[in-house]
Amino acid sequence: MIRCENLSIGYHHAGKNIAVQKDLHLEVQAGELIALIGPNGSGKSTLLRSICGLQAPLSGNVFFRDVALNTLSLAEQSRLFSVVLTQDVQIEYSKVHQIVSLGRSPYTDRFGRLERKDRQIIDESLERVGMLSFAQKYISDLSDGEKQRVMIAKALAQDTPVILLDEPASHLDLPNRIILDRLLESLARDMGKAVLYSTHELELALQSSGKIWLMKPGGGGLLQGSPKELLEQGEIQKTFCNEYFSIDKDGKVHIR
């Protein structure tokens, strides 16, 4: 479904290209749940933004079903990728239903008028994340976990085959992290979505994701494999473990 070829990602500074990672070759298939992990500064957010077109790669190409992403209009891209970013929801005076309805923007007219089908998709998306009964509540009245589910409902309402999430659990307590984890599993398994998310929640990622993308620090590349494969190879331990904690071959974190 998604293919990245010779992808180099990074940023521009003082007229120069500063590469964070180079020559990445990656694929994402429908129904896959992929956790993108790595130390701070290894390029996780930059990679997500480069894949979905929010940030141009330094070189290389991203393809969706063999069509280069840079040949598509923004409207076409918005029907392929929905993105949930890290920052808090700051739309204080909007109701949940209004926020989720923004996901229908790629399909509505220039006035944003919702048809019957749009309203049905919005309600189905809210129901999918367990937030339909909150539709008329103000977003400012919700907990962090509830806000995050609203943003995922917005991504679902966008009706794209691919959902990308940047640190979706960053503001959540443990119970809400587990709820989110199960929801992402369901989107991939039951709806056939390709779900790629970055996270620092190592234990949850290793226990629930079918595939891991491990970004090595200092531009050291990206390793791919199942959690079991990368744990048995010791790659995750080499990347993350220090004198304060260790990770065993079952993906359990042990504090020393």
Language model features: what each stretch is:
Residues 37-39:
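The feature captures the beta-strand-to-loop junction immediately N-terminal to the Walker
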Residues 52:
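Helix-to-loop junction immediately C-terminal to a conserved catalytic motif
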Residues 60-68:
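Conserved ABC transporter NBD signature motif
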Residues 138-142:
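Conserved ABC ATPase signature
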Residues 163-167:
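Catalytic Walker B motif of ABC-type/P-loop ATPase nucleotide-binding domains
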Residues 199-200:
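H-loop/switch region of ABC-family ATPase nucleotide-binding domains
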Residues 238-256:
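ABC ATPase nucleotide-binding domains
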